[in-house]
Amino acid sequence: MSGSFWTSTQRHHWQYTKASLAKERQKLWLLECQLFPQGLNIVMDSKQNGIEQSITKNIPITHRDLHYDKDYNLRIYCYFLIMKLGRRLNIRQYALATAHIYLSRFLIKASVREINLYMLVTTCVYLACKVEECPQYIRTLVSEARTLWPEFIPPDPTKVTEFEFYLLEELESYLIVHHPYQSLKQIVQVLKQPPFQITLSSDDLQNCWSLINDSYINDVHLLYPPHIIAVACLFITISIHGKPTKGSSLASAASEAIRDPKNSSSPVQIAFNRFMAESLVDLEEVMDTIQEQITLYDHWDKYHEQWIKFLLHTLYLRPASAI
């Protein structure tokens, strides 16, 4: 086990550049086009002239739906699946974050069309809990997963252990994950000291923690070190520091604050900018992480859970003759 990100397998085996990540996903894209050239046929109810009828529509394989790298509906849905299962079992956030990383890494190499996504989520949570030293009884885990997704999770717990071997193979047994949460704690302590003297409220820290949680939906954990993500989330938090959201979500408030040039003139923002300059953090990576968050929240506003659930139900439960 590596106690430092800089000597870890996360950095040396699972950190990509944007170009190398795009190359890996292009390989999967081409494989999907070969394996599933027919796309996905879905049956939709339509009403014309007062008469209800069913129509069949084809979603081409080249469409973004059900491609993890392109479909934010799918990304956000996966995030909620892990969180729902985690809440039922009272699993701590570190383990759920590790499960998110396992899922993201796995879906670089495998398509949701060739595996059971719900089994993948269950197995990622099961393995992450073991690695993060908060193991769950497999029967309890499977029981809770079946309560949430009875159509997709078989009652036999050995199916999860079988999937675990598949998951371990794709992860190449590199399981230790370093998260931004620890970096956040360290940076907050530094900010309290001179010359910065920035003390964040409990609400600010909670907002920052939530931003880090949301960041697991996008690719930043595959691209940048944990401290970059922590700094980016702190930057967003400080940008909306003390500003009422008027009932809007943290997501919308963050997006609006980053686009508002007046934020750069606040004393807290000036002090934090000084911290970033003196710490020699890679500003390009920080700004790209912030942009990734804004892009995520723009897509989140358009999130359509019923649509992605419908597609997955059609994909996994359709009769063999319809494939």
UniProtKB/Swiss-Prot annotation:
Record keywords: Activator, Cyclin, Nucleus, Repressor, Transcription, Transcription regulation
Location of the protein in the cell: Nucleus
UniProt cross-references to CDD domains, sorted A to Z: CYCLIN_CCNC_rpt1 (cd20513), CYCLIN_SpCG1C_ScCTK2-like_rpt2 (cd20546)
Subunit text: Component of the SRB8-11 complex which consists of SRB8, SSN2/SRB9, SSN3/SRB10 and SSN8/SRB11. The SRB8-11 complex associates with the Mediator complex. The SSN3/SRB10 and SSN8/SRB11 kinase-cyclin pair also associate with the RNA polymerase II holoenzyme. Interacts with ASK10.
GO biological process: cellular response to heat; meiotic cell cycle; negative regulation of transcription by RNA polymerase II; positive regulation of transcription by galactose; positive regulation of transcription by RNA polymerase II
Species for this entry: Saccharomyces cerevisiae (strain ATCC 204508 / S288c) (Baker's yeast)
Protein name from the UniProt record: RNA polymerase II holoenzyme cyclin-like subunit
Gene3D superfamilies, sorted: Cyclin-like
InterPro entries the record matches: Cyclin-like_dom, Cyclin-like_sf, Cyclin/Ssn8, Cyclin_N
Family: Belongs to the cyclin family. Cyclin C subfamily.
One Gene Ontology term of the molecular function aspect: RNA polymerase II core promoter sequence-specific DNA binding
The protein's role, per its UniProt record: Component of the SRB8-11 complex. The SRB8-11 complex is a regulatory module of the Mediator complex which is itself involved in regulation of basal and activated RNA polymerase II-dependent transcription. The SRB8-11 complex may be involved in the transcriptional repression of a subset of genes regulated by Mediator. It may inhibit the association of the Mediator complex with RNA polymerase II to form the holoenzyme complex. The SRB8-11 complex phosphorylates the C-terminal domain (CTD) of the largest subunit of RNA polymerase II RPB1 at serines 2 and 5.
SMART domains to which the protein is assigned, alphabetical: CYCLIN
Domain Cyclin N-terminal: 45-176
